[in-house]
C-alpha cells in the first residue's frame, strides 16, 4: 500500500517523471559504450593490450566533472548546468555523426577525445537529473529513488542492447546512438522546462 501510494505520488509530478526518463536515455547512451567498448578497441582498433588503460583513463573524465559539479551547480543551478552539459553532449555527438558518416573509423586519438568530452558531460548530467527528479518528492525520497532507478534502468538496458548490436565494423553507430539519446533527453528537458518570469514593465 505504501509503495502504491508512493508510485501515484511519483507520477503526479511532471518534472519528476520527465527527468527519470532523461536519466534512462543518458544512462542508455553510456551503456552503449560499456557494451561495445571492448569490441571497438580490441577488434576494430587492435588495442588488446592498451584497452584496460584507455577504459580506466576515460573514467577520470567522469570523476573530474562529478567533482566540479559540486562547485558549478552553486553558480549556475542544477537545471542550467544540466542544460549546458546536455547541449554540449548533443552537439558534439551530432558533429561526429556528420564528420564520420560513410567514412572509415577516426584515429584512436580522435575517438578517445570524443569519449572524454562526452563522459565529462555525463558527470554533470547524472547527478543533476536525479536531483531535479527527486526535488518535488523529498517527502517520499526512499520510494521515489527506487522508482527512479528502476524506470531509468528499464529504459537504459534495451537502448544499449539495441544500439550495441550495430557497432560491428565501425564506431559510427555509437555516435548515432549517443546523439539520438541526447536529443531525446534534450527534447524532454525543454518540454518540461519552466518558463522564466517576465520582468514587470516599469511605469513611466
Whereabouts are the PLM-identified features?
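A late C-terminal transmembrane helix in Major Facilitator Superfamily
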Residues: 129-172, 177-178
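Extracytoplasmic gate region of multi-pass secondary transporters
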Residues: 14-58, 62
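Residue-level signature of mid-helix packing/kink "hotspots" within the transmembrane helices
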Residues: 59-67, 157
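Helix-to-loop junctions at the C-terminal end of transmembrane segments
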Residues: 65-80
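Transmembrane alpha-helical cores of Major Facilitator Superfamily
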Residues: 24, 56, 60, 116, ...
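Juxtamembrane intracellular "pre-TM" segments in multi-pass secondary transporters
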Residues: 1-20
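Multi-pass alpha-helical transporter architecture, strongest
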Residues: 180-204
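C-terminal transmembrane helical hairpin of 12-TM major facilitator-type secondary transporters
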Residues: 80-129
